[in-house]
Amino acid sequence: MNESVTIRGKDRYKSGVMEYKKMGYWEPDYEPKDTDIIALFRVTPQDGVDPTEASAAVAGESSTATWTVVWTDRLTAAEKYRAKCYRVDPVPNSPGQFFAYIAYDLDLFENGSIANLSASIIGNVFGFKPLKALRLEDMRLPVAYVKTFQGPATGIVVERERMDKFGRPLLGATVKPKLGLSGRNYGRVVYEALKGGLDFTKDDENINSQPFMHWRERFLYCMEAVNKAQAASGEIKGTYLNVTAGTMEEMYERAEFAKQLGSVIIMIDLVIGYTAIQSMAKWARRNDMILHLHRAGHSTYTRQRNHGVSFRVIAKWMRLAGVDHIHAGTVVGKLEGDPATTKGYYDICREDYNPMQLEHGIFFEQNWASLNKLMPVASGGIHAGQMHQLLDHLGEDVVLQFGGGTIGHPMGIQAGATANRVALEAMIMARNEGRDYLHEGEEILAKAALTCTPLKAALETWKNVTFNYESTDMPDYAPTPSVSM
């Protein structure tokens, strides 16, 4: 269907039920304004449901519509405030699924509020019965809207200056086991990992304040470890102190204590919610603190290809919200992440401007105006033997976190950290010399291991470890002469 079927005049407001596409939510001739927010949905209608009607219903139910005509529409600027589905395309190689492009007037949204944005776009429509499934694939956020957010509190450039580390990825490790250690033993892990050559250590998502280790005890032992490691190495170090708690008051208390102890970074979990994330980001900016976000819980709605919210959308929202770090995938690790899709996530985090790149799952141009860049974090099943692949796939503006790949080292935690640092330095040197480090990677690592026993042990221990599973979320990209130009 390529033409509008909107009913105009007094018939539009007659009491009763009317198809969404006839109420003005399907406007194929509409030209989106520069100030419109545009959402791309993957729509899977129920059998027998017209895909155009299903897409118009998504537009309606995510903006001004309800299930029946209401005369109070006439008390508003209804033509302006209705979301408008202006394009519906079949999804390549996915029968029964359709891409619906929907434009929203900027006045529908509160400035600087992810909670309000998400309440409109995904708040109600995902349970709509005429749909088998619905996924929010991407969004275009106009500069006028982007500028109402503070963006990352610190940003990549200032973080590097604060840490005094340039020209290479930063190295980190999540303390393992994530639960059960006493504060003293937890601090010992932090000290050995940092002294061995890592830049950061990290709490995991579910370490908060439990009977085996109170949060205050953990903070004290961790910062003692950081200070000792800094004194021993002469380098600036940090540990992500997870301030996630049951209330905002408790989170602020923990963040303030971390600041008093001299920490350069705190951590929160995605599950605390968008308003709490923005509140902590504002606190971090006021207090010159780097803010790390663990994407805990995201796969419950980002992983399935036909229903939920794409992680590229979450990455955009979190850059607006103001976090400095976000876990964004590894490509080669144990967690979900198609190479092309992951590249798109990293571009969203790190670029000032994103062109449309369908092969990376990016459907719209995105101008980030003056917002700081967001540092992506790679963690989950990575080890020193993959260093050449990680550098090639992810670049240098990234935190590489080797949890098991540090703490599981056969010679101990400090040796594991040293192995990762030596592997990284060897690869950076090869890159700076102009070598083809991706294809020569194994040779480069083997040569470095001749003078580094910890690296030799790491390469031997994990030489056969790979996670070669097919990704469940890949770009829906079918090259054509027009698309591939």
From Swiss-Prot:
<keyword id="KW-0479">Metal-binding</keyword>
<comment type="similarity">
    <text>Belongs to the RuBisCO large chain family. Type I subfamily.</text>
</comment>
<dbReference type="InterPro" id="IPR036422">
    <property type="entry name" value="RuBisCO_lsu_N_sf"/>
</dbReference>
<keyword id="KW-0503">Monooxygenase</keyword>
<feature type="active site" description="Proton acceptor">
    <location>
        <position position="176"/>
    </location>
</feature>
<comment type="subunit">
    <text>Heterohexadecamer of 8 large chains and 8 small chains.</text>
</comment>
<dbReference type="InterPro" id="IPR017443">
    <property type="entry name" value="RuBisCO_lsu_fd_N"/>
</dbReference>
<feature type="binding site">
    <location>
        <position position="379"/>
    </location>
    <ligand>
        <name>substrate</name>
    </ligand>
</feature>
<dbReference type="Pfam" id="PF02788">
    <property type="entry name" value="RuBisCO_large_N"/>
</dbReference>
<dbReference type="InterPro" id="IPR036376">
    <property type="entry name" value="RuBisCO_lsu_C_sf"/>
</dbReference>
<feature type="binding site">
    <location>
        <position position="178"/>
    </location>
    <ligand>
        <name>substrate</name>
    </ligand>
</feature>
<keyword id="KW-0460">Magnesium</keyword>
<dbReference type="GO" id="GO:0016984">
    <property type="term" value="F:ribulose-bisphosphate carboxylase activity"/>
</dbReference>
<dbReference type="InterPro" id="IPR033966">
    <property type="entry name" value="RuBisCO"/>
</dbReference>
<feature type="binding site" description="via carbamate group">
    <location>
        <position position="202"/>
    </location>
    <ligand>
        <name>Mg(2+)</name>
    </ligand>
</feature>
<protein>
    <recommendedName>
        <fullName>Ribulose bisphosphate carboxylase large chain</fullName>
        <ecNumber>4.1.1.39</ecNumber>
    </recommendedName>
</protein>
<keyword id="KW-0560">Oxidoreductase</keyword>
<feature type="binding site">
    <location>
        <position position="295"/>
    </location>
    <ligand>
        <name>substrate</name>
    </ligand>
</feature>
<dbReference type="GO" id="GO:0000287">
    <property type="term" value="F:magnesium ion binding"/>
</dbReference>
<feature type="binding site">
    <location>
        <position position="204"/>
    </location>
    <ligand>
        <name>Mg(2+)</name>
    </ligand>
</feature>
<feature type="modified residue" description="N6-carboxylysine">
    <location>
        <position position="202"/>
    </location>
</feature>
<feature type="site" description="Transition state stabilizer">
    <location>
        <position position="334"/>
    </location>
</feature>
<feature type="binding site">
    <location>
        <position position="205"/>
    </location>
    <ligand>
        <name>Mg(2+)</name>
    </ligand>
</feature>
<dbReference type="GO" id="GO:0019253">
    <property type="term" value="P:reductive pentose-phosphate cycle"/>
</dbReference>
<feature type="active site" description="Proton acceptor">
    <location>
        <position position="294"/>
    </location>
</feature>
<keyword id="KW-0456">Lyase</keyword>
<feature type="binding site">
    <location>
        <position position="327"/>
    </location>
    <ligand>
        <name>substrate</name>
    </ligand>
</feature>
<keyword id="KW-0113">Calvin cycle</keyword>
<comment type="function">
    <text>RuBisCO catalyzes two reactions: the carboxylation of D-ribulose 1,5-bisphosphate, the primary event in carbon dioxide fixation, as well as the oxidative fragmentation of the pentose substrate in the photorespiration process. Both reactions occur simultaneously and in competition at the same active site.</text>
</comment>
<dbReference type="InterPro" id="IPR020888">
    <property type="entry name" value="RuBisCO_lsuI"/>
</dbReference>
<keyword id="KW-0120">Carbon dioxide fixation</keyword>
<keyword id="KW-0602">Photosynthesis</keyword>
<dbReference type="Pfam" id="PF00016">
    <property type="entry name" value="RuBisCO_large"/>
</dbReference>
<dbReference type="InterPro" id="IPR020878">
    <property type="entry name" value="RuBisCo_large_chain_AS"/>
</dbReference>
<dbReference type="InterPro" id="IPR000685">
    <property type="entry name" value="RuBisCO_lsu_C"/>
</dbReference>
<feature type="binding site" description="in homodimeric partner">
    <location>
        <position position="124"/>
    </location>
    <ligand>
        <name>substrate</name>
    </ligand>
</feature>
<dbReference type="GO" id="GO:0004497">
    <property type="term" value="F:monooxygenase activity"/>
</dbReference>
<feature type="binding site">
    <location>
        <position position="174"/>
    </location>
    <ligand>
        <name>substrate</name>
    </ligand>
</feature>
